[in-house]
């Protein structure tokens, strides 16, 4: 099964907790703090695997979690850093944040990697909190939570040449003639339901990748038929071979077919119409096809289409196929490469930016609830198992303006205050 679009959940690993420990050694009566730091949590990393062609592997597994870092130990020993979770994707995969729509990256080159969820840093051990006032601190940090997000993976087939046209105009047949690909071929519409790729190898040593794309019909750019589901694959092709059948009995006019496909491509993305295009008249072995082709070619020439960009072929007899492939290779030499989708560029900005506002709300039972990224992160990294750690967290809250915010919200001494799942009493 061909899968080209999927949403997955990624959870990076939490950093390891820092350690509260002291040096205990013979003849060293005041060894001091010796708690080590926690190890970094594992990140979620996507990488391009040349052997993959679809996102099929994500059909049955859509949740990925990296390991947490190891906790710090005594004797200033650091916790072990967790291994990153590496996930293979095919070349041509665009990664976006499912919630914001931000493009995180466009994976097009073999071996290319992208970090989609960063592991949390390890918490610091008590050896970092020594001060002149507290030479034996019982303070440490818990590991930082790893990033969590939902991402959307969208595969756009990477091919040099794309075959476009109405259903059953001979795209799959042409691909099977010029490559070793074995697409499904039958005399009914929408035989091709997935893109098929093949390598064209010419006698002069030139080669290129050709993609047989599912047939388009009127309204495809609005989702009719296979619609946008496969129009996206045209975006990554450098040259288009536009196939138009000359069958006198199909009930359609070749020029109308040509115009309709061009209209749908332009409605989806007008940049596609700027790509080099060769017009290919197919099924020229049928009776009456030559007359239809003569009228069709005359109409194209009148519109300014170059004569050397119009071909007539029969995939059944292989007539005209070799000249078409050589011309395609010639056009490819000067055809521009597609521009990868630009990921949001993350640059360091050292200008002052205020922290997101601390929010104080009140539950129906009278408990004041504190929310905000900074305060929630500080809480998750606070080790409240020791009095020193609890006092440090209280000082952090005060420095963030929590006391003033609670008073402004009407809190009085003795009222309950909640952060996440932790509840404490407000004391003036």
From Swiss-Prot:
Mg(2+) binds at residues 172, 192. Residues 1-158 form the Obg domain. Keywords: Cytoplasm, GTP-binding, Hydrolase, Magnesium, Metal-binding, Nucleotide-binding. Its cofactor is Mg(2+). Its EC number is 3.6.5.-. It is found in: Cytoplasm. The keyword Amino-acid biosynthesis does not apply. GTP binds at residues 165-172, 190-194, 212-215, 282-285, 314-316. One of its GO terms (cellular component) is cytoplasm. GO terms for molecular function: GTP binding; GTPase activity; magnesium ion binding. It is an enzyme of class 3 (hydrolase). It holds the Pfam family GTP1_OBG. GO terms for biological process: ribosome biogenesis. Its main location: cytoplasm. Residues 159-333 form the OBG-type G domain. Residues 350-428 form the OCT domain. PROSITE patterns: G_OBG, GTP1_OBG, OBG, OCT. Belongs to the TRAFAC class OBG-HflX-like GTPase superfamily. OBG GTPase family. Monomer. An essential GTPase which binds GTP, GDP and possibly (p)ppGpp with moderate affinity, with high nucleotide exchange rates and a fairly low GTP hydrolysis rate. Plays a role in control of the cell cycle, stress response, ribosome biogenesis and in those bacteria that undergo differentiation, in morphogenesis control. This is GTPase Obg.
């Amino acid at each position: 099964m061909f899968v080209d679009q999927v949403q997955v959940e990624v959870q990076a690993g939490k950093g390891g907790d820092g350690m509260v420990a002291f040096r205990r050694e013979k003849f060293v009566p005041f060894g001091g703090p010796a708690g080590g730091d926690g190890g970094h949590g594992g990140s979620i990393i996507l990488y391009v695997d040349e052997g993959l062609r679809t996102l099929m592997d994500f059909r049955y597994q859509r949740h990925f979690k990296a390991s947490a870092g190891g906790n710090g130990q005594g004797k200033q020993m650091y916790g072990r850093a967790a291994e990153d979770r590496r996930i293979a994707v095919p070349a041509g995969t665009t990664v976006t944040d499912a919630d914001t729509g931000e493009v995180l990256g466009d994976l097009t080159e073999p071996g290319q990697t992208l970090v989609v969820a960063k592991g949390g840093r390890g918490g610091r051990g008590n050896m970092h909190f020594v001060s002149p006032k507290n030479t034996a601190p019982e303070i440490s940090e818990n590991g930082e939570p790893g990033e969590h997000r939902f991402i959307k993976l969208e595969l756009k087939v990477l091919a040099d040449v794309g075959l476009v046209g109405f259903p059953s105009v001979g795209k799959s047949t042409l691909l099977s003639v010029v490559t070793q690909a074995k697409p499904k071929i039958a005399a009914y519409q929408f035989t091709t339901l997935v893109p098929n790729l093949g390598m064209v190898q010419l006698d002069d040593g030139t080669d290129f990748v050709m993609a047989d794309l599912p047939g388009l019909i009127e309204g495809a750019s609005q989702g009719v038929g296979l619609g946008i589901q496969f129009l996206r694959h045209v975006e990554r092709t450098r040259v288009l071979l536009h196939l138009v059948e000359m069958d006198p009995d199909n009930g359609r006019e070749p020029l109308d077919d040509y115009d309709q496909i061009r209209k749908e491509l332009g409605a989806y993305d007008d940049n596609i119409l700027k790509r080099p295009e060769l017009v290919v008249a197919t099924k020229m072995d049928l009776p009456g096809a030559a007359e239809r082709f003569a009228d069709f070619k005359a109409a194209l020439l009148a519109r300014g289409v170059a004569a050397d960009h119009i071909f007539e072929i029969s995939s059944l007899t292989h007539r005209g196929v070799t000249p078409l492939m050589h011309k395609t290779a010639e056009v490819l030499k000067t055809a521009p490469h597609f521009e990868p989708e630009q990921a949001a560029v993350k640059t360091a900005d050292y200008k002052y930016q205020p922290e997101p506002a601390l929010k104080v709300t009140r539950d129906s039972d009278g408990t004041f609830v504190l929310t905000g990224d900074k305060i929630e992160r500080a809480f998750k990294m606070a080790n409240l198992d020791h009095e020193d750690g609890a006092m440090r967290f209280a000082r952090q809250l005060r420095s963030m303006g929590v006391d003033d915010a609670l008073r402004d919200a009407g809190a009085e001494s003795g009222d309950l205050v909640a952060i996440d799942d932790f509840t404490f009493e407000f004391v003036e």
